[in-house]
Amino acid sequence: MNWAGLYAILSGVNRHSTSIGRIWLSVVFIFRIMVLVAAAESVWGDEKSAFTCNTQQPGCNSVCYDHFFPISHIRLWALQLIIVSTPALLVAMHVAHLQHQEKKELRLSRHVKDQELAEVKKHKVKISGTLWWTYISSVFFRIIFEAAFMYIFYLIYPGYSMIRLLKCDAYPCPNTVDCFVSRPTEKTIFTVFMLVASGVCIVLNVAEVFFLIAQACTRRARRHRDSGSISKEHQQNEMNLLITGGSIIKRSAGQEKGDHCSTS
């Protein structure tokens, strides 16, 4: 699996993410993808070949392995990382659309150089307006996917621990046989580590949702305050104009009266 390609895509989104979003990407890449590639795959590399049962019945080992491990831990984690990272593509596509619109407006407004158009792609897009809704929706989807996979993992492997001895009576085993898992303690440690990393990602995503909401409320309050101050300033200017205009009228009336008296 090309994890470098996935990281390149996520890094493109990372430029337009919040500070919490950047921490989330670091946790995903360093503590999950790197561990999955560097360590976990070697630990689970012999899971099927080293799974043995105390019987010589052909097919019993394979049937018992499939019964207790319907899907490999490695494949389940890989699928989880891919699906959890997918919502970030929504943000990437939205940012690309906004940058395309900005380039289009620049071309229509004036003659621009290719270098200026290339610079548009490097600009950080502010998370506001429709992009805010896209971004917060992607974070919500990440939370849902993480929680769903943790629940699926619990349904498939109750207790999240690797059992050393398994009792299997599935056909074609002649009777209840004992099956043994290789390196159960090491696999349990990696399982707990990956689940803790998944829990940390959920906490970071929830924190990012609250951060985005607080940021939006702050911008709204600032706009309301600025519009209120502008409105008060406008009213004060109108009042000053009225006062100034009234004093001018009074002076004009007094001057006309003085001229009339002098003429008389």
Curated annotation (Swiss-Prot):
Short name of any one Pfam family annotated for the protein: Connexin
PROSITE patterns (alphabetical): CONNEXINS_1, CONNEXINS_2
Keywords: Cell junction, Cell membrane, Gap junction, Membrane, Transmembrane, Transmembrane helix
Compartment list: Cell membrane; Cell junction, Gap junction
Gene Ontology BP term (one): cell-cell signaling
Highest taxon listed in the record's lineage: Eukaryota
Bilayer topology term: Multi-pass membrane protein
Gene Ontology cellular component terms for the protein in this record: connexin complex
Tissue-specificity statement: Lung, liver, intestines, stomach and kidney.
PANTHER family reported for this sequence: CONNEXIN, GAP JUNCTION BETA-1 PROTEIN
Protein's name in the database: Gap junction beta-1 protein
Source organism per UniProt: Xenopus laevis
